[in-house]
């Protein structure tokens, strides 16, 4: 029986460094098989529930296509498609769905919700995103980094993340760096740093794995020598508009632009973004942002960087599929 069978995937620190590498190796194998047309279906007859309290493009498509590729069937429960937490408790929902499904994905708000689902469902539960963590995204990121620097192991790579580091991406990056021994720099104003106690705990683990975690407000110091630059949106659609101006003013200096790429001193530096990105005014929100906040060239990243040869964001997006498939196969298949 494989080491992942019937386990949950709630956050990265639930796994050992070796287990994270094993999942990445499985994703690489599954991706190769899909590309060559020789993929073997290991989830035939399995039924999967996808609970989305927050809408999504990449996460939903990745789970659905991964399931179909492997012969499984899915039921999508959107923001208005279930009674979870409204007419029915999370605990009761978990016990009902666990009788009908072989695996459950949750994308929503508090981490406690997905943990409660896992506690009572009796089947593997996977975290597609919560306010605190985004572990499936980090698996895709690590796979993408390995692919683009094949001659470097993860524990020899340097990644600088610019922007608001207090969110689920900042937390999951900390966990990932600590586990694989990466050199991680969180480059942000102090007001946007993660919780200190959590940072300290990840730094302690990083010391054991050979990693290094640095927090700095200094952009030049933070990005110097980086192999990868990473950013995410500065504001979320669910946040009140009143906080947008303050956040944007705070983070404007941390925009990823060509000047920042030059500061790395690495002409081969690559750019990562978990998407969607506000890099132009070709969307309703993007146009509104550009006009209202004087951001004609993009918000967290400029159009110039996003469309450049440095950008590997669509390789990164594709790898959501292969890494999510690896998680499902590993936790629902005995072999």
Swiss-Prot record:
Residues holding L-ornithine: 168, 232, 236-237
Catalyzed reaction equations: carbamoyl phosphate + L-ornithine = L-citrulline + phosphate + H(+)
Gene Ontology cellular component annotations, sorted alphabetically: cytoplasm
Any one biological process term the GO annotation gives: citrulline biosynthetic process
Principal location: cytoplasm
InterPro entries per UniProt: Asp/Orn_carbamoyltranf_P-bd, Asp/Orn_carbamoylTrfase, Asp/Orn_carbamoylTrfase_sf, Asp_carbamoyltransf_Asp/Orn-bd, Orn/put_carbamltrans, OTCase_ArgI
Binding positions (carbamoyl phosphate): 56-59, 83, 107, 134-137, 274-275, 320
Listed pathway(s): Amino-acid biosynthesis; L-arginine biosynthesis; L-arginine from L-ornithine and carbamoyl phosphate: step 1/3
Record-linked Gene3D superfamilies: Aspartate/ornithine carbamoyltransferase
Swiss-Prot/TrEMBL keywords: Amino-acid biosynthesis, Arginine biosynthesis, Cytoplasm, Transferase
Entry keyword Cytoplasm: yes
Molecular function as annotated in GO: amino acid binding; ornithine carbamoyltransferase activity
Pfam families for the chain: OTCace (PF00185), OTCace_N (PF02729)
EC number(s) recorded for this UniProt protein: 2.1.3.3
Annotated PANTHER family: ORNITHINE CARBAMOYLTRANSFERASE SUBUNIT F-RELATED, ORNITHINE CARBAMOYLTRANSFERASE, MITOCHONDRIAL
Homology family: Belongs to the aspartate/ornithine carbamoyltransferase superfamily. OTCase family.
NCBIfam families: orni_carb_tr, PRK00779.1, PRK04284.1, PRK12562.1
Job description of the protein: Reversibly catalyzes the transfer of the carbamoyl group from carbamoyl phosphate (CP) to the N(epsilon) atom of ornithine (ORN) to produce L-citrulline.
Protein name from the UniProt record: Ornithine carbamoyltransferase
Gene: argI
